[in-house]
Each structure stands twice: as C-alpha cells, then as structure tokens.
C-alpha cells in the first residue's frame, strides 16, 4: 500500500510510505549500523530482562526488530504518523501506535521506557519544534532511562573545500528548507538539546560514511551513493514546488546537481550523522 505525503496528518514528511521508501530506509539502516557497529549506543544494561523500548518514527519497525535480537524478553513499542508500514501481525512483544512527535504523548507512557529511540525525524521540524519534541521524548524515559537520537549533519568546515558541490547543495537546502518547516541543522543542535531538557551523561558519536568512489568498500560506497541520490531527488522534487516569487529557484539547484554529479563521479561524496544519547536523572 502507498500512502502519499499529502495524506499524512500535519506532516512535513516529503516521501511516500511505499515499497521504495521501505527499501531506502532499510539501506540507510544497514549503512548506519555498518559504521556504528551496533544499534544501541547509549550505555543501557542490555542484559536486563523485560527492557521497555520505544522507537519513535518507526516506519515498519525494522530498527526495533534488529535492536531486540540480543535482548531478553523486551517489550517493544513503535510509533509513526502513519500506520501504512506497520507489520500485520506485529512481531511478538511488539505494539505499534499512530503518534506524531508534535502531539501530546499518552499520559500512561510518561516515565516508563528504559530507552527512547528516534532516528532522522527532528530535521522535519523547526528548531523550536525540535527542542519541544526532545523534551517530550525525554519525559517518556523512566528515571535512569536513556534517550538516543540520530540526525544528519552538514559538512564540517574543513570538508567544504574537498566537496565543494556538496557544500553548495547543503547551503541551498539550508536556505530553502525553513519554508517547508524543516531544519537541516538538527544534527548540530540535538546534542545540546539533550542537555537543555535536563538529561545527564550526554554522549555523541559522529558517523561519517564515504559515498561512491570515496569509500574503500565498493558495496558500502554504492549503497551510500544510492541513498544520497534518493534523498537529493526528494529535494529536487520539493524545489519544483516552490512558488514563482520564491528567492530560491529550482534552476539554481539543477546547476548544483550537475556539478555534484561530476564531483561524485570523480572523488565521491560524504554522508554525516550525529548519534547522541543522554540519561534521565535517577530518583534520589
């Protein structure tokens, strides 16, 4: 089943809920896992039985299924703004619920989860909305529980001269996306947000995935290139919907794409992510 973005309630999501998106997210999952080595980086004691884990923005629950493999009888909850990709029937000990990060969470969920996880969702909100969402996610963790978030990051200043076309693309999107209610700088902000909402022991892992020719592993490099091209295609589609009086022109983005194609064919490109985690203060 395909659910188009126009049918999603109060959503800034720019991609349809269909098999193409499922394939893209599975490949993205595999890429990130290959470079982080594991799915749960927060220092949660994974030997404890009956851990309660929430995955916000779960899509089809694949992260939950994979993350649960080393755990003993975990209680898993997945949420998303659309039920279109929810597995039916759900896996054992797993429940799925419709939930937007901008809406109030169920009162019965407050202070109940050992781990609250979310990946690549906050960029689809404004900076203020992102901070509010993180505060609400933190409230779902039990005292002593953990919150782990993943967001994309822009190029570091030292990398901009190596990938000039990619830097131009980021700069264009950074100017364009606020008009869609997005925040491409979420990956730079999210670690600070964890501290701002009162979490402790905040940690961060920076993940860099070389794309195409820049990657010494041909398989991972090709996967990364396919994923990056898919995402860039979304921005191309979004730019075509800009109003005629917009200061951002689709033609400008097309020029950047031409240069980026040359860049990726000659030296490759780069994907960057921030994985951050923090602990809810324990009760005295």
Curated annotation (Swiss-Prot):
GO biological process: methylation
InterPro entries in the record: SAM-dependent_MTases_sf
Keywords: Methyltransferase, S-adenosyl-L-methionine, Transferase, Virulence
Biochemical pathway: Mycotoxin biosynthesis
Molecular function terms, GO-annotated: methyltransferase activity
EC number: 2.1.1.-
Protein family (similarity comment): Belongs to the methyltransferase superfamily. LaeA methyltransferase family.
Role summary: N-methyltransferase; part of the gene cluster that mediates the biosynthesis of sirodesmin PL, an epipolythiodioxopiperazine (ETP) characterized by a disulfide bridged cyclic dipeptide and that acts as a phytotoxin which is involved in the blackleg didease of canola. SirD catalyzes the O-prenylation of L-tyrosine (L-Tyr) in the presence of dimethylallyl diphosphate (DMAPP) to yield 4-O-dimethylallyl-L-Tyr, and therefore represents probably the first pathway-specific enzyme in the biosynthesis of sirodesmin PL.
Name of the featured protein: N-methyltransferase sirN
Organism encoding this protein: Leptosphaeria maculans (Blackleg fungus)
């Amino acid at each position: 089943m395909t659910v188009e973005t126009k049918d999603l309630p109060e959503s800034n999501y720019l991609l349809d809920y269909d098999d193409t998106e499922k394939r893209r997210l599975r490949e993205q999952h595999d890429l990130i896992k290959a470079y982080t080595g594991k799915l749960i980086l927060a220092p949660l004691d994974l030997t404890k039985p009956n851990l309660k884990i929430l995955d916000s923005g779960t899509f089809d629950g694949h992260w939950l299924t994979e993350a649960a493999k080393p755990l003993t009888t975990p209680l898993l909850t997945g949420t998303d703004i659309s039920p279109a990709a929810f597995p039916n029937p759900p896996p054992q000990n797993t429940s799925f619920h419709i939930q937007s990060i901008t809406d109030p969470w169920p009162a019965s969920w407050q202070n109940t989860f050992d781990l609250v996880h979310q990946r690549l969702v906050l960029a689809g909100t404004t900076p203020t909305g992102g901070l509010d969402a993180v505060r609400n996610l933190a409230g779902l963790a039990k005292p002593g529980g953990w919150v782990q978030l993943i967001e994309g990051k822009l190029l570091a200043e030292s990398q901009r001269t190596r990938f000039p076309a990619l830097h131009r693309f980021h700069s264009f999107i950074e100017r364009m996306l606020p008009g869609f209610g997005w925040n491409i700088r979420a990956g730079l902000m999210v670690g600070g947000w964890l501290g701002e909402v009162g979490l402790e022991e905040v940690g961060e892992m920076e993940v860099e995935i070389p794309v195409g020719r820049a990657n010494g592993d041909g398989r991972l490099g090709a996967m990364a290139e396919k994923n990056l091209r898919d995402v860039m295609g979304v921005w191309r589609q979004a730019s075509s919907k800009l109003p005629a009086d917009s200061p951002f022109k689709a033609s400008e983005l097309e020029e950047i794409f031409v240069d980026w194609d040359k860049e990726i064919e000659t030296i490759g490109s780069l994907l960057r992510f921030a994985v951050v985690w923090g602990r809810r203060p324990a009760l005295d």
